[in-house]
Regions:
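Short linear proline/tyrosine/threonine-rich motifs used for host-factor recruitment
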Residues: 35-37
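Contiguous, non-catalytic segments that form substrate-binding/exosite surfaces or channel walls
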Residues: 172-322, 519, 546
Length: 570
């Protein structure tokens, strides 16, 4: 997951905009001068004074009449640097704190983020700032492409905060910090009752914030659009119905097949320190800029960092599961590549991060699945693994690695799920969130419904809450609406791969070589470089030559797993 963009979505985005105040008398004098008014009691003077006394709307109109687009552009550029400074501070606290701070620092960290949020929200939502952005929007034909994008993004960010009381927003930030600490305790002790009250409070706060933003819209629709602009329940219901229609019977066919891949070659105990050495080599093979990269350890893998020149990845390593850290690193490094690949000229602006969580997950899932789980990449990957575990893996072949990593096995843990059953894990969370946000259930009902859905979709019994509803960190951060982007991002990736091959790339040969530069260059020029300047729909259309189509994803899954399991449709 990408913690950096989550902070931006949740805080929207802890932006700081300096107040722009122009004394009304100065404005009056300027207009009077333009109208060649010399006497104080002329009719024109009375007209100007009345305009100033009427309304904020008229003030905005006068600002537009007075403004010089060049002056406003200069103000925007200056303000964007201030936005960046506050964003940098907030992301550094929010990204690194959970990874490196001692436990007792949580309350202080939460208070710091809450106070930053209060100050930033107040300045971002100042009417004068809105007036500046409105003027620039009205004059957008005079702006270059970059400034137009900045104005679009800042107006969107402002609209998500302007009607939310500052106290409500700051209480939410404080609560997420507390809830995250409690979640970790609850997970480690397998005690849902510890976390349940925090979850109920987070749900109620989120609903209250959504009500303040737009009472006419369903809260979950608003949250879904926050994480992937333009989406809602109708969009995702259609998406998941298409996926479920293919995946559910395909899983059943794979499980019934006589051809069953074995995981035994990758079983055993693997030294954790050597796993971290392997992780560092994965950073190299994926082509990250190590001068702009930091690797840490955490309970739940995530990517964060304050800027293009400083991206952090946090992962975990388990002695009994060597593939867990391998694929977590491939995934999180996909997020990191996206952040590092953003146009360097976007530094110090609101464009200097990924455009959405769906797009971000498409990058992480692409390197985890379409590259990392491909048969072609199994050769360079097993060579890398043999380097660090020669005694254990020297006799393991690339095909054995590919087979073990792609074995379809309905399971409990989302992050350890195989590629085929993974979207069902996401579907379960999507349905759970709908029930929570609609009020159909409360936190006390979650474990039972969770177990029911895992039995329904995956046929497994949930033995503990640690392996059930406490396994993911997202709800403790208040990230309702994030989960569906994992499945959507996975689906985006199939369309990228199709487009790469259609343009003449020998995708398998690139993966087999271990030199992923052609893939990085393709994604970099079509996706990464744009930052937030373009939305997902624009990026997919530009990269693939057509709008998003879920059928590329369902066909990819059908073809791949039919071949692995020897099914008739292969």
């Amino acid at each position: 997951m990408c913690r950096k963009d989550v902070l931006i979505v949740l805080g929207r985005s802890l932006f700081s905009i300096a107040q722009i105040t122009i004394n009304n008398r100065v404005k009056y004098d300027a207009i009077a001068k333009r109208l060649h008014i010399t006497g104080k009691h002329t009719g024109h003077t009375y007209f100007v004074e009345r305009i100033f006394m009427d309304s904020a709307h008229n003030t905005v109109e006068l600002n537009a009449a007075l403004s010089n687009p060049r002056d406003d552009i200069a103000k925007l550029d200056e303000l964007e640097k201030k936005l960046f400074a506050f964003n940098y501070a907030a992301n550094e606290i929010g990204s690194f704190g959970p990874c490196i701070d001692p436990k007792k620092a949580a309350e202080e960290r939460g208070e710091a983020l809450a106070i930053l949020g209060e100050q930033i929200q107040e300045t971002l939502c100042d009417p004068a700032v809105g007036a500046l952005l409105d003027r620039l929007h009205e004059n957008r034909a005079l702006l270059d492409e970059t400034h137009r994008a900045q104005v679009k993004i800042l107006r969107r960010d402002r609209s998500q905060l302007v009607d939310v009381p500052v106290e409500l927003q700051s209480n939410f930030v404080r609560l997420t910090t507390e809830a995250n600490e409690v979640w970790e305790q609850a997970k480690n002790s397998d005690d849902w009752s510890l976390f349940a009250p925090k979850l109920d409070s987070l749900i109620e706060l989120r609903k209250e914030m959504c009500q303040a933003r737009d009472a006419s819209k369903d809260p979950y629709d608003l949250l879904l659009s926050d994480f992937e602009h333009g989406t809602n329940r109708e969009f995702y219901n259609t998406f998941f119905n298409n996926v479920k229609e293919v995946v559910v019977p395909l899983v059943a066919d794979c499980m019934a097949s006589k051809r069953q891949p074995s995981t035994k070659p990758l079983e055993g105990k693997f030294d954790v320190n050597r796993q971290w050495d392997l992780a560092k080599d994965l950073v190299k093979i994926q082509g990250l800029d190590e001068d702009a990269y930091w690797l840490g350890k955490t309970e739940h893998p995530y990517t964060g960092g304050p800027g293009i020149g400083f991206v952090m990845v946090a992962s975990h390593a388990y002695e009994n599961n060597v593939l867990s850290n391998v694929y977590s690193m491939l995934h999180e490094n996909g997020h990191a590549l996206y952040e590092q690949g953003i146009n360097w000229e976007y530094r110090f602006t609101s464009l200097s991060t990924g455009t959405s969580m769906g797009m971000h997950e498409s990058q992480s899932r692409f390197f985890e699945n379409y590259v990392g789980l491909s048969e072609a990449f199994a050769e360079p990957l097993i060579q890398l693994m043999r380097k660090h575990f020669p005694g254990q893996l020297n006799r393991v072949t690339a095909f054995q690695l590919f087979s073990a990593a792609n074995k379809v096995q309905p399971s409990l843990i989302r992050t350890e799920a195989d590629e085929l059953t993974y979207p069902l894990h996401i579907l379960i969370r999507y349905e759970m969130e709908q029930a929570l946000l609609s009020g159909e259930i409360t936190a006390k009902d979650v474990p039972a419904l969770w177990a029911e859905k895992y039995k329904q979709y995956l046929g497994v019994t949930v033995p503990t809450n640690t392996e059930g509803a406490l396994q993911d960190v997202h709800w403790s951060w208040g990230e309702f609406g994030y989960f569906p982007t994992y499945a959507l991002g996975s689906a985006y990736g199939a369309q990228y791969k199709h487009a790469m091959i259609a343009e003449g790339m020998d995708f398998d040969a690139v993966c087999a070589s271990g030199d992923l530069a052609p893939i990085r260059e393709w994604l970099g020029s079509r996706i990464w470089t744009w930052g937030r300047a373009k939305d997902s729909k624009e990026l997919i259309l530009g990269a693939c030559g057509e709008p998003f189509d879920v059928h590329y994803y369902t066909k990819y899954l059908t073809d791949k797993y039919s071949r692995i399991y020897g099914l008739a449709s292969a």
